[in-house]
Amino acid sequence: MGRSLKKGPFIADSLLKKVEKQNSNDDRSVIKTWSRASTILPVMIGHTIAVHNGKSHIPVFITEQMVGHKLGEFAPTRTYKGHIKDKKGAR
């Protein structure tokens, strides 16, 4: 179930302020954020936002196709190292 339309999309206030400040100054430096739950808005297109994955910040360049998705979708939190091929060969 999605979020109610009358509430609007969730975005952290601090993140929105940083994006709007950079838009007014024509600055495109990387913005660090821990807010993985924030929705990507059209105002963010062209910015690089470093999203925290629990260990480090992953830089994510925002494009038009990402609008409406969450920032956390583009910064994976788990690493998959593959299955062990053969336990007998390891001995």
From Swiss-Prot:
<dbReference type="InterPro" id="IPR020934">
    <property type="entry name" value="Ribosomal_uS19_CS"/>
</dbReference>
<dbReference type="InterPro" id="IPR002222">
    <property type="entry name" value="Ribosomal_uS19"/>
</dbReference>
<dbReference type="GO" id="GO:0019843">
    <property type="term" value="F:rRNA binding"/>
</dbReference>
<dbReference type="GO" id="GO:0015935">
    <property type="term" value="C:small ribosomal subunit"/>
</dbReference>
<dbReference type="GO" id="GO:0006412">
    <property type="term" value="P:translation"/>
</dbReference>
<dbReference type="GO" id="GO:0003735">
    <property type="term" value="F:structural constituent of ribosome"/>
</dbReference>
<protein>
    <recommendedName>
        <fullName>Small ribosomal subunit protein uS19</fullName>
    </recommendedName>
</protein>
<dbReference type="GO" id="GO:0005737">
    <property type="term" value="C:cytoplasm"/>
</dbReference>
<comment type="function">
    <text>Protein S19 forms a complex with S13 that binds strongly to the 16S ribosomal RNA.</text>
</comment>
<comment type="similarity">
    <text>Belongs to the universal ribosomal protein uS19 family.</text>
</comment>
<dbReference type="InterPro" id="IPR023575">
    <property type="entry name" value="Ribosomal_uS19_SF"/>
</dbReference>
<keyword id="KW-0687">Ribonucleoprotein</keyword>
<dbReference type="InterPro" id="IPR005732">
    <property type="entry name" value="Ribosomal_uS19_bac-type"/>
</dbReference>
<keyword id="KW-0699">rRNA-binding</keyword>
<dbReference type="GO" id="GO:0000028">
    <property type="term" value="P:ribosomal small subunit assembly"/>
</dbReference>
<dbReference type="Pfam" id="PF00203">
    <property type="entry name" value="Ribosomal_S19"/>
</dbReference>
<keyword id="KW-0689">Ribosomal protein</keyword>
<keyword id="KW-0694">RNA-binding</keyword>
